[in-house]
Amino acid sequence: MTPERAVIVGASHAGAQLAANLRREGWSGEVVLIGDERGLPYHRPPLSKGYLAGKNGLDDLLIRGADFYEKQHIRLLNATVEAIHRSAKRVSLSTGDTLTYTKLALCTGARARRLPTPGVDLRGIHYLRTAADVELIRAAATPGRRVVIVGGGYIGLETAASLCSLGMNVTVLEATERVLERVTAPEVSAFYTRIHRGEGVEIRTHALVEAFSGNGGVQEVVLADGESIPADLVIVGVGVVPNTELASAAGLSVDNGIVIDDQARTSDPDIVAAGDCTSHTMARYGWRIRLESVSSAGEQAKVAAATICGKHSAIAALPWFWSDQY
């Protein structure tokens, strides 16, 4: 008899927590955790905070040590899943191999939203989503250099605080009328603006980026009103896009994220999903929502693990967020 196998696609917070919770819920079959980044799964929230500021090493960010996965018989596989064959209950990997599953969990996360702006491919323009991204930024983050951060959300402001602490001259460009407009009240926006300006960060609102210019590397950020802002380094933080392409190609329901119910089930009863890649209807609010938070990813991972094990659990926690600046 073929042993049961749970395959988890995506080895960030949701995937790693789902794997651990499968064992906690009593899953005795195989557990395979597939990720496209080398090394052990790590926490992403510190990337724009302590890791960028040089206060933490990558080992400090690990969700669990290697011994945990060994003791729990969780197989870590460095590969990219290229296709899901639902009728055969099989996934195709970038290595050329295939892997069958009894239950499949999609924890594919999200990627940094790219700007369609002229000059965006110039050297010195970065996005911040992975540890490798941070290492590139840190290599260029020397005191006295001018960094322009496009986007005044949590990532943009946390990055601003970290780079300011490294002695850089920091300018934040926000297209709307206030920072954190999408996620907080005006009072909170005003608080963060005051804190940043007090630390010497220049906050510019209603600032629309028209283009980036430079000779090989970025030298200026050109605004829609014609103003040019000198820049030695640019960090773009304008949100994320859920990684739903794999699910969509497999015929699963997608609506601003992989659609799941309150038990983390997708439109296929043998496939669950958790984390930033999902959207679900919150009973409290009565509408579908996609949450980009580690707390939500952790809760969904617990529920998804219970569902795989045939137990009833439901996504119910209120969304909450935190930030660490200065």
Predicted regions and their residues:
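FAD-site-proximal beta/loop scaffold in flavoenzymes
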Residues: 121-143, 214-222, 227-306
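Short hydrophobic core segments
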Residues: 9, 99-109, 150, 229-239, ...
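Glycine-rich dinucleotide-binding loop and its adjacent helix/turn
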Residues: 108-166
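Beta1-alpha1 glycine-rich phosphate/pyrophosphate-binding loop at the start
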Residues: 2-74, 162-183
